[in-house]
Amino acid sequence: MVLIRVLANLLILQLSYAQRSSELVIGGDECNINEHRFLVALYKSGRFRCGGTLINQEWVLTAAHCDRRNMEIKLGMHSKNVPNEDEQRRVPKEKFFCDSNKNHTQWNKDIMLIRLNSPVNNSTHIAPLSLPSNPPIVGSVCRIMGWGTITSPNETYPDVPHCANINLFNYTVCHGAHAGLPATSRTLCAGVLEEGKDTCKGDSGGPLICNGQFQGIVSWGGDPCAQPREPGVYTKVFDHLDWIQNIIAGNTTATCPL
C-alpha cells in the first residue's frame, strides 16, 4: 500500500509539472483591467502604432523606432473601442533620443523619452510605473503586455491588451539566436525557449516588468514571432537611468551610455 501511495504521488507531481510546462507555451491572455495603469498607447493618424510606459505624471518611456510625427498618446485605455471613463489624451511636448540624429540599431539606443504637453492625474486606470531600483536578474519571471498582434506571421490585433509571463535569459542566448547581434549590448534577452510566447508587432515600446520592476522596453525579435529558441530583445532600462533622470531634471544635453 505504501508503494502504491508513493507511486500515485509521483504520478500527480508529474502530471502537475506537465500541465505547468504546457501552460508556459500558450500565448497571453487579456490583461486584468487594473494591472496596466501605466501602459499607454501611441497613435498616428487614428491608428494604433506602439505601446509605452508612463513613468511619472509628465513623461512616457518607449522605443525610438516608435517615433512618428503628430503622435497622439492615450492613457488609461483598455479596450480600443470602448473608452474608460477616465481615459486621457496627450500629445508630445518634447521628444528625446540617445542620439541627436535619432539614430538607433537593433541592439543600441532604441529608447525615446516623451514629455507630455500637460501632466496627467492619477485615476482608476492611470498611474505611473517607477523606474527600477535594482538591475535585472537572469532567471527572473517577467511580465509583458500590449495591444500587439496575437498571431504571427498572419496578424490579428486584439481590442484589449494581452499579458503573458516570460523568462529573463542571459544575453548570450539572444546573441546565439539572432544573427548580427554584437557580443555585448545594453539590451535584455527574454522569452520562452519553447514556441508560443513572445511580444510581437505592435507591442514595441511597451514594458518588460521583472520581479515587479520596469526593466526593459520592447525592441525587436524574430519574424515570425514566438519561434522556438528565439527570445525577444529589450532595451535595458537600468543602463539608461542616468540619462532618463538627467533629461527629466532639465539637462537636455545629457548623453546615453556608450
UniProtKB/Swiss-Prot annotation:
Q: Name one Pfam family in it.
A: Trypsin
What InterPro entries does UniProt report for this protein, alphabetically? Peptidase_S1_PA, Peptidase_S1_PA_chymotrypsin, Peptidase_S1A, Trypsin_dom, TRYPSIN_HIS, TRYPSIN_SER
Tell me the keywords, alphabetical order.
Disulfide bond, Glycoprotein, Hemostasis impairing toxin, Hydrolase, Protease, Secreted, Serine protease, Signal, Toxin, Zymogen
Q: What does this protein do?
A: Snake venom serine protease that may act in the hemostasis system of the prey.
Extract the signal peptide range. Answer: 1-18
Q: Name one GO cellular component term.
A: secretory granule
Active-site residues, record numbering mapped to chain: 65 (charge relay system), 110 (charge relay system), 204 (charge relay system)
Q: Where in the cell is it found?
A: Secreted
All disulfide bonds of the chain are 31-163, 50-66, 98-256, 142-210, 174-189, 200-225
| Assembly and interaction partners | Monomer.
For this protein, the Enzyme Commission number is 3.4.21.-
> What PROSITE patterns does this protein's entry cite?
TRYPSIN_DOM, TRYPSIN_HIS, TRYPSIN_SER
From the Swiss-Prot or TrEMBL record, give the protein name: Snake venom serine protease KN13
Family to which the UniProt record says this protein belongs = Belongs to the peptidase S1 family. Snake venom subfamily.
Top-level taxon of origin: Eukaryota
Chain positions listed as propeptide in the UniProt record? 19-24
Indicate the segments forming the Peptidase S1 domain, all copies: 25-249
